[in-house]
Amino acid sequence: MCGIIAVLRRPSDRKVPTAERITAPLVGAVDLLARVEPDLLGEAADLLGEADRLLGGVPGLLALDRDPTLVGRINEVLAPVPAHLASLEAAVAGSPDVEAANAALVRVRDVLWAVSRDRLDTFAGVTSLRQDRPVPSDAGLAVLLSAQQALSALDRLEVRGRDSAGLQVTVWNHGIDQHDPEVVARSADPLHRSGSVRVLDGGGLAFVVKASAEIGELGDNTAVLRSALVADGLLARALAAPAVQGSLLGHTRWASVGLISEPNAHPVDSTRADGELVPLVTVVQNGDVDNHADLAASEGLSLAPEITTDAKVVPALCAAHLAAGRERLEAFRRTVNAFEGSVAIGMATGDAPDRLLLSLRGSGQGLFVGLAEDTFVVASEPYGVVELTADYLRMDGETPADPDDPGASRGQIVELDAAIAGSVDGITRRSYDGRNLPVTTADLSRAEVTTRDIDRGDHPHFLIKEIGES
């Protein structure tokens, strides 16, 4: 059991909302709740939803960042709400249509949670990640928003495994010379341990932070990742560039193949042990590549002995296909077709930092592509995407595209394009045998859970929470 997360974002063209624009629907909603009339709950939920929408994405983040009083104003407006909700509980119990009134009350609670926890807490998380020397640009804050959202999802996905974790922050248009002494020094680690940097074909930089511990609590690993990001002065320099863009690829691991160590923590990259230069590929993987040892031998993959995870063969083999001149998507397709086992993969390549490749085959894993404002968020469970969006595409690793050829056509491959992030137009989907599988809005599902449902609060484990609530 492991967890995959990825965030791919395009620059937003929505205007940054004013404080008044954000607080007005909140004030209206609180006024309606104060009337303690169940029939008004739906209208109040709509107003709260409008405020949540305005606070979402990069424009909402920038609104909070530019007005240091806004968080306090929002909290002040919402302060009377708990008392109103307590009164409404009794009113709902006496409503002629208790079921409908209770559903509206649940919706109000869900959206209030989204505003206070998902939006305001996300802003606090971004603030904790930033450095003020140098100050991040607005574009840099957008990258930090993606990082915060990825870390938040990893916190939730840790229940699928937590002996190690890793996060790759890939940036381009950053203005840093690839021959900068710190870049050169940090790109020399062949084991891709925490703090490593990889230089992309177009001059972009991929920063990786990792944590590894056999014993620990939920949240320990992401705390280590956060601290490493905050301490990274080179990353801070990149995020100060006015036009910087970035993508995130992360993983939390339960080791099934390979030791618990930083070199084995994902993402793993395509660096060869013999020093031969190959195209840059980085990968996160759930499940096991059962024939990884056979592939390493038959394909002549040069793997460092310190890296014993089966996932290492994925970028190594894909890099070999790229080096042979194959196009990116075809190289990926050939790579994943070589594997035996139930496997989910997220892959980034050095020639296209604005693209993300995904594959899923078998019944034991899952991948969900969330479509949020200007953003794709990918997770191995729906609860990894719901902080950003309720709408997602579920990849199907079992149904054959051609029932007459199930062996070859079972499994799906997806390519995401940051230039059209958040839209089905930015999703290219194919079967394992290369058949085009167009994606429309009819293919999307809607999550039935919210972040309020899956929050474990102050409980160290979900089991303890469930026992306490039973």
Feature-to-residue mapping (PLM):
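Conserved short alpha-helical segments that host acidic/polar catalytic motifs at enzyme active sites
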Residues: 1-469
